[in-house]
């Protein structure tokens, strides 16, 4: 039985995604005026198999996610050229910025869990007895 060797180096995708995230965070912090877009944190990078495209996930505080996404995607071409100068690879991926909803959903789930665990008249959990001193 013949085995086909993978042409990609194991873990390369993850290492490259981490490096892109690190470099982009530095470029955005140093070079782009993000006062309109609030405080932006890059939370992850997802690369296509051929490294031609990258989804860059971000979270934002102090501004609307759509405003931040529009500003980042407007600067994507310039950010691509800056990455090209830093990364020593043949193909630097085209960048697309996407608001990361995982943190927002996590907070919503935490609130729902706290609400469900809160003692109340319909929860089946008795309220704290009142002190009758």
From Swiss-Prot:
GO terms for cellular component: cytosol. Gene3D superfamilies: 3.30.300.20. It is found in: Cytoplasm. InterPro entries: KH_dom-like_a/b, RbfA, RbfA_dom_sf. GO terms for biological process: maturation of SSU-rRNA. One of its GO terms (molecular function) is ribosomal small subunit binding. The keyword Ribonucleoprotein does not apply. Keywords: Cytoplasm, Ribosome biogenesis. One of several proteins that assist in the late maturation steps of the functional core of the 30S ribosomal subunit. Associates with free 30S ribosomal subunits (but not with 30S subunits that are part of 70S ribosomes or polysomes). Required for efficient processing of 16S rRNA. May interact with the 5'-terminal helix region of 16S rRNA. Belongs to the RbfA family. HAMAP family: RbfA. Monomer. Binds 30S ribosomal subunits, but not 50S ribosomal subunits or 70S ribosomes. NCBIfam families: rbfA. This is Ribosome-binding factor A. It comes from Bordetella parapertussis (strain 12822 / ATCC BAA-587 / NCTC 13253). The gene is rbfA.
């Amino acid at each position: 039985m013949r085995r086909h060797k993978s042409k990609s180096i194991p873990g390369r995708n993850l290492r490259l995604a981490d490096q892109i995230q690190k470099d982009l965070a530095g470029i955005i912090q140093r070079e782009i005026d993000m006062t309109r877009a609030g405080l932006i944190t890059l939370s992850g990078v997802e690369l296509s198999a051929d490294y031609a495209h990258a989804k860059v996930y971000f979270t934002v505080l102090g501004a609307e996610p759509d405003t931040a996404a529009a500003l980042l995607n407007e600067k994507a071409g310039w950010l691509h050229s800056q990455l090209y100068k830093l990364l020593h690879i043949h193909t630097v991926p085209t960048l697309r910025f996407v608001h990361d909803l995982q943190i927002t959903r996590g907070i919503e789930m935490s609130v729902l869990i706290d609400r469900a665990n809160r003692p109340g008249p319909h929860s089946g959990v008795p309220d704290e007895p009142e002190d009758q001193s």
